[in-house]
Amino acid sequence: MSMVETAPSKIQVRDLNFYYGKFHALKNINLDIAKNQVTAFIGPSGCGKSTLLRTFNKMYSLYPEQRAEGEILLDGDNILTNTQDIALLRAKVGMVFQKPTPFPMSIYDNIAFGVRLFEKLSRADMDERVQWALTKAALWNETKDKLHQSGYSLSGGQQQRLCIARGIAIRPEVLLLDEPCSALDPISTGRIEELITELKQDYTVVIVTHNMQQAARCSDHTAFMYLGELIEFSNTDDLFTKPAKKQTEDYITGRYG
């Protein structure tokens, strides 16, 4: 099962294959990512879920030995073409990584940095954008009195929310989250999960997670991957309660992986 038709598609993946040199990492992937919903990728380490996520904003483009074949359609436009403007793509498709990665600058400038690359705002408008992004990331009340302190002064959970605020400050259409809670404590993880659920009101969210309970709590749709192949993709509740494939059932019940 590769299509989820409960909402319009934001991203359509068609016959996608990906290679690290000669290693065939993704094999004939076909799936649709629903607009303004949360889609989770699960599977054992090395199954290709992070590789798939990173094709959505061509993170591999700096490495000539890595290549993608097939189509990834963002609102109907194939982003895998050589004519795709990478900077414009990454303005539309933001990304938050596994480990919090604040820039070595103030909290304010962490948010403003990306905005300045794409927009020329007055100071008042930039102040408003910074407040908006931090509010969206549930971080404004904790940082409003120390905006000019270093981003490194924040706790790990706060730093990850800062990275989310930085990602949405340029107003992308899609937000990619690669294991965003793996380095966080349970309380910080809970806050990030609440935030993910809220973000889908404005963004299409795709999350990679090793935590199946997290996928069950946060996502509307879940894809199970194994050895570079998409094994099953369906409504999250259905995948976890009545999986269609034995491989999926074995994985979610802990029989392998």
From Swiss-Prot:
Q: InterPro entries of this UniProt entry?
A: AAA+_ATPase, ABC_transporter-like_ATP-bd, ABC_transporter-like_CS, P-loop_NTPase, PstB-like
Task: State the protein's purpose.
Answer: Part of the ABC transporter complex PstSACB involved in phosphate import. Responsible for energy coupling to the transport system.
| Bridged cysteine pairs (disulfide) | none
Q: Which domain of life is it from?
A: Bacteria
Give the record's GO CC terms: plasma membrane
* Localization per Swiss-Prot or TrEMBL: Cell inner membrane
Stored PANTHER family: ABC TRANSPORTER I FAMILY MEMBER 17, PHOSPHATE IMPORT ATP-BINDING PROTEIN PSTB
Q: What protein name does the entry list?
A: Phosphate import ATP-binding protein PstB
| Family designation | Belongs to the ABC transporter superfamily. Phosphate importer (TC 3.A.1.7) family.
What's the EC number here?
7.3.2.1
Q: Which GO terms describe its biological process?
A: phosphate ion transmembrane transport
Keyword field:
ATP-binding, Cell inner membrane, Cell membrane, Membrane, Nucleotide-binding, Phosphate transport, Translocase, Transport
Under Pfam families, the record lists: ABC_tran
* Gene3D superfamilies in the cross-refs: P-loop containing nucleotide triphosphate hydrolases
